[in-house]
């Protein structure tokens, strides 16, 4: 079984794709990109539009990479779990990010801190 996880933080967006086989977890891909989602959130209480766009663009690339891995591994799809932390939790407009990622087929969970 293959799994993918996306972690959207205040500064970075990370991807981890693993294969679980016979009880052993094998890392296939690990990516990290600087997205600076949290710029200005502490002062304004909102996510900036350009920061949301950077995250959406990054997650879109990650989804394409996950689809390519699924094809290589000859599986129809790989489930993607996505979480967001502090900046999304603190922003009044985090729902906009959640909605934009949902359009990509990624359901984002904003986790408590």
Question: Each PLM stretch: what is its role?
Answer:
Residues 1-8, 16-113:
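Nucleotide/phosphate-binding catalytic cleft detector across ATP-hydrolyzing
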């Amino acid at each position: 079984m293959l799994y993918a996880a996306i972690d959207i933080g205040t500064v970075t967006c990370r991807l981890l794709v693993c294969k679980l086989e016979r009880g052993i977890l094998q890392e296939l891909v690990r990516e990290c990109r600087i997205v600076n989602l949290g710029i200005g959130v502490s002062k304004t209480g909102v996510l900036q539009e350009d920061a949301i766009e950077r995250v959406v663009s990054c997650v879109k690339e990650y989804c394409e990479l996950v689809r390519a891995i699924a094809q290589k591994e000859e599986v129809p799809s790989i489930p993607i779990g996505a979480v967001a932390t502090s900046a999304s939790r603190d922003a009044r407009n985090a729902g906009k990010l959640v909605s934009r990622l949902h359009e990509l087929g990624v359901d984002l969970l904003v986790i408590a801190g």
